[in-house]
């Protein structure tokens, strides 16, 4: 089951989230918005298992990577039973 994976512009390009992901959902892409000149990207969200290891690995104060599990998303939209 895929989950929503959002990357925010607070990403510092450290690659911690990419290395933490057991299913290779994340990768780094070029970006001029930070010192590292790269930012995390999530091109394979269909492979996300929702473990949130990427969130745990993120060293920024405001998590740059956020995973929304399917059941959390439907509940927040009032679609859960």
From Swiss-Prot:
[4Fe-4S] cluster 1 binds at residues 11, 14, 17, 58. Its EC number is 1.97.1.12. GO terms for cellular component: chloroplast thylakoid membrane; photosystem I. Binds 2 [4Fe-4S] clusters. Cluster 2 is most probably the spectroscopically characterized electron acceptor FA and cluster 1 is most probably FB. GO terms for molecular function: 4 iron, 4 sulfur cluster binding; electron transfer activity; metal ion binding; oxidoreductase activity. Its cofactor is [4Fe-4S] cluster. The keyword Transmembrane does not apply. It comes from the Eukaryota. The keyword Isomerase does not apply. Its main location: plastid. It catalyses: reduced [plastocyanin] + hnu + oxidized [2Fe-2S]-[ferredoxin] = oxidized [plastocyanin] + reduced [2Fe-2S]-[ferredoxin]. [4Fe-4S] cluster 2 binds at residues 21, 48, 51, 54. One of its GO terms (biological process) is photosynthetic electron transport in photosystem I. Coiled coil: none annotated. It is a peripheral membrane protein. InterPro entries: 4Fe4S_Fe-S-bd (IPR017896), 4Fe4S_Fe_S_CS (IPR017900), PSI_iron-sulfur_center (IPR050157), PSI_PsaC (IPR017491). It is found in: Plastid, Chloroplast thylakoid membrane. Keywords: 4Fe-4S, Chloroplast, Electron transport, Iron, Iron-sulfur, Membrane, Metal-binding, Oxidoreductase, Photosynthesis, Photosystem I, Plastid, Repeat, Thylakoid, Transport. Residues 2-31, 39-68 form the 4Fe-4S ferredoxin-type domain. Apoprotein for the two 4Fe-4S centers FA and FB of photosystem I (PSI); essential for photochemical activity. FB is the terminal electron acceptor of PSI, donating electrons to ferredoxin. The C-terminus interacts with PsaA/B/D and helps assemble the protein into the PSI complex. Required for binding of PsaD and PsaE to PSI. PSI is a plastocyanin-ferredoxin oxidoreductase, converting photonic excitation into a charge separation, which transfers an electron from the donor P700 chlorophyll pair to the spectroscopically characterized acceptors A0, A1, FX, FA and FB in turn. NCBIfam families: PS_I_psaC. The eukaryotic PSI reaction center is composed of at least 11 subunits. This is Photosystem I iron-sulfur center. It comes from Panax ginseng. The gene is psaC.
């Amino acid at each position: 089951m895929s989950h929503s994976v959002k990357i925010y512009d607070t990403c510092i390009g450290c690659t911690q989230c990419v290395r933490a992901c057991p299913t290779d959902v994340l990768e780094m892409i070029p970006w001029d918005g930070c010192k590292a000149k790269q930012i995390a990207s999530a091109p394979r969200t269909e492979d996300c298992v929702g473990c949130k290891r990427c969130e745990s690995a993120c060293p920024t104060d405001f998590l740059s990577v956020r995973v929304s599990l399917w059941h959390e998303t439907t509940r927040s939209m009032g679609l859960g039973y």
